[in-house]
Amino acid sequence: MKKLAQLRARTDRQLAELISAKLDDGFSYARVLTAREPHAGRAELREFERRAEDAWREADHLLPALGGVDEAARGTLLRRAGILREALDRYTAEAYPIRRAAGF
């Protein structure tokens, strides 16, 4: 039973690290989007947006599986996911104002 608990703890730790890495990736892509790099083309920005969204989606999908990590670590990951989501929503609202106004 002790081995099973150790395995579960290690798996939870690895899952938390994976989620954190996905969020880091998402923040990296979002930073490029919000910096409005003058040399970045429209296709490039759409690719960064897609990758940031994918990173957030993957992290958000994995978060409910975090059962064995302490509440502080879980809370930190949830807050980071929320901040990334807000940044992406803000970018979308600014980059596609017509889409937002039309409710798409």
Regions found by a protein language model. Give the residues of each.
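Short terminal alpha-helical segments
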Residues: 1-38
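Amphipathic alpha-helical binding modules
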Residues: 73-104
